[in-house]
Each structure stands twice: as C-alpha cells, then as structure tokens.
Amino acid sequence: MGHLGRIRLFVRTIRTFLTNLKRHHGNDYASLGDLVLHYDKKSDGAFAVKPTESAKKLVELGDDSFYLVERFKEHESIARMDSYKHLVRLFTEQCIVEKDDNDNSNKVVIRASKDISSDSLQNPSDPDAGYCGHKGKGYQMQVMETYSKDKSQPNLITHIKVESANQSDANALIPAIEDAQSKELAPTELLADTLYGSDSNIEQAKELGVTVIAPVMGKKEGAMPLSAFTFDDNNLITACPEQQVPQRIKSDKGVTTVIFNKALCDVCPRQSECLVKREKKNCTLTYDDKAVRLTRRRAEEKSDEFKDSYRYRSGVEGTMSDLDRMTGLKHLRVRGMPQVCLAATMKATGLNILRIVAFKNRLKRPKKANKRSNPSLDRFLDAVKEQFRRMWNYFGGRDFCYA
C-alpha cells in the first residue's frame, strides 16, 4: 500500500471515483465538464506544489470533493458505489463545512493535521488500513506463542489477530487469552510487553486463570514509593517508612485516606521525599487499591525472580523476525482486512509446520558423545592453543634473515 500525503490522498480518491463514474455512468461523468480535466491524467505531477502553497491546494481539492459529494448524494446507484463512499468518508474526516458570514454560502475548511483521527482513510485502494505514529500506515498483527525453558516442547504460535495499525495493544490481551481458551490452548503464565500490562488487564487475566508478567506502565515512582509503607492484608497502611503509626484511617468508595500525627511529621528527617501531604492540622495520604497493586508490581520488577522470568519475552521478537524473513509477512500482495487476515493466518500456520519439523528432526538426531574426559586438561590445552595462535599471527607476517 502506497503512503500518501494529504494532497495525494485527495487526488487518488477523487480520481478513483471519477474513473468508476466514467465507466458506469458516462453521461453523469460528461456533465461535470472542466472539473475532470485535471484528474484524467494518471500522474500526480499536476498537483505537486511548494510547501507554502499546499494549504491553498488542499482547499481547492476540498472544494472539488464537496461539489462531487453534493452533486451525487441523491443519485441512488452512484451513492452505492464504494468509490463514492470513500470520497464521502475522506471529505467527512478531512474537511468541515462552515457558513460564510458575507453571503451565507457553504465554505469548506480543511481540518488541522492534529485533528485527523488515526482510523481515517489512508488510501482508497485499502480502506481498512489505519495509521500509527510509531508503526506507520497499514496493519498490525497480535501474536501469542508458547515457550519451554528446557526445550522439551516446540515453540508454536497459538493466537494471531490482524488489526488496523491504529488499534491499541492494551485492548488485545484479554481477547487473545479468551481466543486461546476457546481452543483449549490457554496459558497459565503469560509474558507481555508494557502496553499489555495495565492494571485492568492484569486483574481480568487473573479472573481467567492466567498470570500476566509485564512491566508497569506510567512514570517511575519517586525516592519514596508507596511500597515503602507497611500494609496489612486489607491494603491498609499500618506504619510509614519511619515506623510511625497512623492516627486514623478512612475508607470511602474504594479510596483510603490515612491521617498521621502532624507533630511527628514536622520533625521527620524524610519529609522532603515523603508522599504524605502536609495540611494545616494533619498530614494525610490518599490512595486506592489500584495504587497498591501497581506499587507492589514495581517493587517486584526489581527482583531477580521477575528478571529471570521476563527475559524469555524477547523470544517473540525472533518469531516476528521469522514471519518477516521466512514468510514475507510485512510485504503482502493483498489488500483489505479479510485478505490480509487469511494471508497472515496461512503464513503463521506455515511457520508452525516448519518449527514442528525442525523439532522432530532434532529429536531424531543422535546426541553427540561427550569427548571431554578431563575438563581441566582440556582447558589447559585450549589456553596453550590460544597463545600459540596469537604468536603465529604476530610473527607470521614478518620476514626473517638467517646467517
């Protein structure tokens, strides 16, 4: 799919509509007169302008789009054409119709680029494609695969889902788990990237019987995190980092407010970094259960156990590389969501077949016998060989004269 700027997007969409109009409704096409002259050329060179003139050219294209949309909106057969629907969609997403104060006529105003939605039309040849500032225009694919630490099982893809590029990864985790459960392939532990690890996703996954291991989104906590306070089993603070006990605790609608003695807080050596807010009469700290869960997860991220478990997540990047290099997934020769979904599914299936064959062949291959009877002696010989190799490289390129 070509990457079109706003001017080329207008030109391609209008030209596609006029081409179909000429093919199926020749008389209506002929009635447009001089409007179609610029769009008859297959090249977009006639619409190439300097950056300083692009705003003016966009207004002209917006006026042409508005004229065509209004001209044929009552024509039933033309209004049913996909190319006309794309033109209407483009105009709605890119333009605004306002009333002119002078003569009360309609005036087309081009929307600012920042106001254009990421799910807007990117190319009339592929209306299902979306836009992502990080990934660009087109589609994205969610992938979930198995992994085995001891290599006793092959790593196989258990879930894929093709989406428009504008879709957020945060909304993909729970549907992926539910899809895997419907196939009886649901994992007990799932490693995911940061965007998948929202608190809502973690809690919903627990209800589905899946433990999600993912870094916490958002800003890092300050010098004194909430986890520095002591909590009981009900997520209530029992002491501050300096072991001062709260005077009283109030809970209302899931929000907990802890009140500390202001006299003690005034002489605390850590008051500059403390989370407690200083008020006239008291010092208070307000939090909810979500904040407690997040701070505990941030504390767990620093543990060796978390790092050892999470390091396997990077393996899925190798899978994405395999899908690209071995199957050409990033360069499909089809357009439209149904066709892209079918192609992606077949390529993922093909990669699974290749992995199963490689796994079976590895099991059939006889294991090499361990020839090292004396590891200490072998290490000594390896060191001697390395020194000899260095000396050979050093003297090998020199000329010597003998008497």
Task: Indicate residue ranges for each PLM-predicted region.
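Anion-binding and metal-coordination hotspots
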Residues: 1-403
